[in-house]
């Protein structure tokens, strides 16, 4: 793969294009606009369906008819299509792609090496966001391709920082990322449902129980993320001797709560490895 002269992305004027106009692309675009990282006038995508066109146009994004139009009018291009069609899509657009453009993939399970081979160059960054992107609370992880620069990484950090938090990691860790943050929201949804059911069993009205459960999880997560204390210390702080909390924790420990969560992450990681093994 021949190296091209490096051209920095013009951070003050660059245009962002989405190949694929689904819910995740919409969440990213909305977050970027809402946070002020980019004005909607510098974002574009393509779709022929009225519902998806309306969704993007409702906050000012330019919606074109064809993917090639998006590529020709963008400096940073995010591929957000389904894994089973990404190869075909990238190969179709390959004649229009150049190393003057920064390419980004949020497609699950498709490795950088494959993306680089299909695109014909390696100025690529792979990002794995998760579904809380829809409410601006994504946990995303990125890995840089062979010729993506530190400046490219900073640009993507700023973009995806608009929908939550983003970390940098080696791509070989992405199956484990899938097992933890990719599948993790479903584990937490299950935990919230179980907490609410427990509240109902203890006599609370369903609506109150669900509200208390979801807000408790949100508050506890915020204490871990922002407070600087280890979760074990936070647990100890609230579990007083002979009290209600330690009695509840005792039941969780008898049920193998920690081990079950750990096993869920490991099992999902292994399944990711099986599904996306090539």
Curated annotation (Swiss-Prot):
Enzyme Commission number: 1.5.1.2
Record has Nucleotide-binding as a keyword: no
Keyword Amino-acid biosynthesis: yes
UniProt keyword list: Amino-acid biosynthesis, Cytoplasm, NADP, Oxidoreductase, Proline biosynthesis
Coiled coil region boundaries: none
Location within or outside the cell: Cytoplasm
MF annotations from Gene Ontology: pyrroline-5-carboxylate reductase activity
Pathway per the UniProt entry: Amino-acid biosynthesis; L-proline biosynthesis; L-proline from L-glutamate 5-semialdehyde: step 1/1
Biological process terms in GO annotation: L-proline biosynthetic process
Catalytic activity: L-proline + NADP(+) = (S)-1-pyrroline-5-carboxylate + NADPH + 2 H(+); L-proline + NAD(+) = (S)-1-pyrroline-5-carboxylate + NADH + 2 H(+)
A cellular component annotation (GO) from this entry: cytoplasm
Protein origin, superkingdom: Eukaryota
Main location as per UniProt: cytoplasm
Family, per entry: Belongs to the pyrroline-5-carboxylate reductase family.
Entries under HAMAP family matching the protein: P5C_reductase (MF_01925)
Protein name (record): Pyrroline-5-carboxylate reductase
């Amino acid at each position: 793969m021949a190296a091209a002269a490096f051209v920095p992305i013009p951070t003050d004027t660059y245009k962002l294009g989405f190949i694929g106009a689904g819910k995740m692309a919409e969440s990213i675009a909305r977050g970027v606009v809402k946070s002020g990282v980019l004005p909607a006038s510098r974002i574009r995508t393509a779709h022929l369906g009225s519902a998806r066109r309306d969704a993007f146009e409702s906050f000012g994004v330019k919606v074109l008819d064809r993917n090639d139009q998006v590529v020709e009018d963008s400096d940073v291009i995010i591929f957000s299509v389904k894994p089973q069609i990404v190869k075909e899509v990238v190969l179709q657009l390959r004649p229009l792609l150049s190393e003057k453009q920064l390419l980004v993939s949020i497609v699950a399970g498709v490795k950088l090496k494959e993306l680089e081979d299909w695109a014909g160059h390696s100025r690529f960054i792979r990002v794995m966001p998760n579904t809380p992107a829809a409410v601006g609370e994504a946990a995303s992880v990125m890995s840089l391709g062979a010729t993506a620069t530190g400046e490219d990484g900073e640009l993507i950090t700023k973009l995806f920082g608009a929908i939550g938090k983003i970390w940098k990691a080696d791509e070989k860790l992405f199956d484990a990322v899938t097992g933890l943050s990719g599948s993790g929201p479903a584990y937490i949804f299950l935990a919230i449902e179980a907490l609410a059911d427990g509240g109902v069993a203890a006599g609370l009205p369903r609506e109150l129980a669900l509200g208390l459960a979801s807000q408790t999880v949100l508050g506890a997560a915020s204490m871990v993320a922002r407070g600087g204390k280890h979760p074990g210390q936070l647990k100890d702080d609230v579990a007083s001797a002979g009290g209600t909390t330690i009695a509840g924790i005792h039941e969780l420990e008898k049920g193998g709560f920690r081990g079950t969560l750990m096993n869920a992450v490991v099992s999902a990681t292994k399944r990711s490895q099986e599904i996306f093994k090539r």
